[in-house]
Amino acid sequence: DAIVGLKMASGSGLTPQITAAVAMLQGTSCSAYLDPHLDFDTHDTIADQGVHQNTLFAGISELIAALEAASLLGTTTIVVMSEMGRTPKLNGNTNNAGKDHWPYTSALVLGAGVKPGVYGGTDDQLYGRGIDLATGKPQDGALPLAYDNFAAGILTLIGIDSKEWYPNVTPIQGFIV
């Protein structure tokens, strides 16, 4: 009943989506997808990137507070991620410089069942290092974390047998309590 009549206008930020997500999680839904409708793709004008990231982090804080107020934070896992990363260096010398696509990215995972920490790592050139999937710690000679290892780890974290979806993939376990 809490989401009947709720209208989410495009570009109105995360607040209406957070309200709807919490209402759905209080009901019968077991997942929700939130999209801030922001352009994080800053090939140029790098100054915009910080503004958009601050908006995103404020939204994450708002989501955490709303989940906590609804007594859902202890049973909810939050995953914030992108399909790609950005180069660690600017693509030019002007005020309009930005960052191009980069094969390494990061994810923020928090909430129920998550062991706090930093998992994975980069070398001196900022390329992804291999990791031990059991611990999430960098390990020489190991393969870098792949998307399927991460997805299998998230499934494992939320209590789903990852082998049903990724039968030949080892999930990352390091961030799981």
Report the location of each language-model feature.
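Feature marks hydrolase-like catalytic cores characterized by long aromatic- and Gly/Pro-rich stretches
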Residues: 39-177
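Anion-binding catalytic surfaces of enzymes that hydrolyze or transfer phosphate/sulfate esters
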Residues: 1-70
